Amino acid sequence: MADETIIFSMNGVGKTLPNSNRVILKDIYLSFFYGAKIGIIGLNGSGKSSLMKIIAGLDKSYRGEVVWSPGYSVGYLEQEPQMDEDKTVLEVIQEGVQQTVDLLKEYEQVNLKFCEPMNDEQMAALIERQGELTEQIDHCNGWELDSKLERAMDALNCPPAQASVKTLSGGERRRVALCRLLLREPDVLLLDEPTNHLDTESIQWLEEHLRQYKGTVIAVTHDRYFLDNVAGWILELDRGEGIPWKGNYSSWLEQKSRRLEMEEKQESKRRKTLERELEWVRMAPKARQAKSKARLGAYEKLSAQDAVQKEASLEIFIPNGPRLGNKVVAFKDVSKSYGDRLLFEHLNFVLPPAGIVGVIGPNGAGKTTLFRLIMGYEQPDGGQIEIGDTVKLAYVDQQHKSIDPDKTVYQTIAADSDFVRLGRREVNARAYVSRFNFSGADQEKLCGVLSGGERNRLHLALTLKDEGNVLLLDEPTNDVDVNTIRALEDGLENFAGCAVVISHDRWFLDRIATHILAFEGDGSVYFFEGSYSEYEQNRKERLGDEPKRFRYKKLME
């Protein structure tokens, strides 16, 4: 809970993107209390990361004033964290508790010196220093450092301690950086998409950790359950303005709905006034020219008002493929392993014809391998995979290899044609692309400069135009804003076929999933009919309420 001590203020802060006239932040006035938990939300490109960099002191190119109260430490988790490539995972994580590490090293060196010959004065000095070090280590509970590091690394599913940083994937680097930052325990935590690349168990641990965190937490995230469970304040960046709300995400949604209704009423009233004034101006006789000028001035004033631009109404169009029969995909006693690691064994499930199956589990558990087995890119070690005769698969993976960075968005979809064929129908190519939130100049962007979220939407548009009736979507919500996720939810709910979706976004899964396929460790995969929340309740009843870190089952003990 915040203690009402203001530690940070923004006074009239604004920012314009370099080499353009686009204003992303304008006249923002904010104050943060110590201990506050704040979630920052907004569309992609609304200035969330820019605001975080200004708060962190990394971006000085802004208008206005930023004031920190003295004596508070700040830690920032960037989307692409920096770390020494020549270090091991453990060495990087230890940087978060470097002072304690140094104390323990010196304490060990002091103890070794007792074996060396020395006079009484040197001995007394050594004993005194040993006492000082003991007191300092006691104060920071340094004797428990090894177990503390182990718990933190396990909770965030970090790579092995001795793994080299240069071999880590982007997701692994993010988890290592988050672990290092949390161990530092700064007064203010700035977290840019902290749940990206975390499995569900790690997200739940992080939520509990941040709820109990004594300092201030400011997080940019599209994870709506995270915002509901952690945030006590929501800061919405909307058309350059910062709009604070005291409450979690659910309460923010309610007031946002009311605010949009009010905006629509005000805009409707303004338009009606404009229409009345314009009608009077057009019909006024010359004899009333003086009064007409006054009315014309009123009209022009209304016209010049900055009408509040509505948020774009996003839509992701998922065309229905050919009619899907009753038999979709069936796994019968399927097993799969890599080397001595068994991913799953005796896996049995049947995909429902009109269902949406959410696939959950830690990174590296075998979720993407499951998709590759369905696609036929890999073969099972045992068992059978049966695909129905009417099935037409459409696979949206995370690699996006089919996207040429030197082509524009429009060229990628249209392929030198003005039309896109959807089954027996032809639709205007630009209209089709616009239904995935690429409109106007965005269609002429080169694919090589697209953001992660834009590449996700483009790959979705590219794959879906083939009109599959069974969709395999691998992490479709990564790097996209909440509005785009909502549009995807609506698109999937209106899709007539079957969809299988790998995701760590619990709110998204609760909205769309009719079934859950959960990788639960030790080669076990559990198929459950119901929503994500219903599965979680079922899991707790079966396995208990305590988190259980995922373990691979070895083929040979």
Language-model regions: role of each:
Residues 255-288, 292-298, 302-309:
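Intracellular alpha-helical coupling/juxtamembrane segments of multi-pass membrane proteins
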